Amino acid sequence: NGDLFIFIIDLYRNQQIRKQMGNDDGRLHTMDIFFQALQDTMLAVQNVINAAESMGLGIVPLGTVNDDPKAMLKVLDLPELTYPALGLQVGVPDQEPQLKPRLPLEFTTFENEYPRDFEVSELKDYDEIVQTYYDLRDANRRIDSFTNQINGKKLNTHQNKRDDIVEAIHSQGLALDFN
């Protein structure tokens, strides 16, 4: 329900401009330029989210576009130096979902120095809030907590097609050079 947007990291266009103006690819294959393009793409995503929400539309960010990166590249028939960064579904909401609880500020912000020392027990209150959130949802109800998700099987040695992301990015000619 709604429209699907897939936001693409696009350095192909820059390559074509350089080529038509008599230049080689220059630094287009570097990690630095890849990160700049990724950041530009994420800013575009955020701008579309802001615009959609200002019009009363609902949004669902979809990281699942990278669940099978090789298949996604094939389906989208993308040229070299491009890569699908994020999907976004935009549409008229059929319900008013409860907002997912956010980590407390003391775990997401800092001043001048990253706080390295904390105890998992400090997340107890947040875990309870997240557990209640999942338990009260209309769809995909479950008993779960933030710390259980972080400590769960997804971050163990679990192998899936998402493990091919770096290979897929490199196959597109992106982030090949770390200089």
Model-derived regions, located:
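Acidic, surface-exposed loops and disordered segments
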Residues: N1-N179
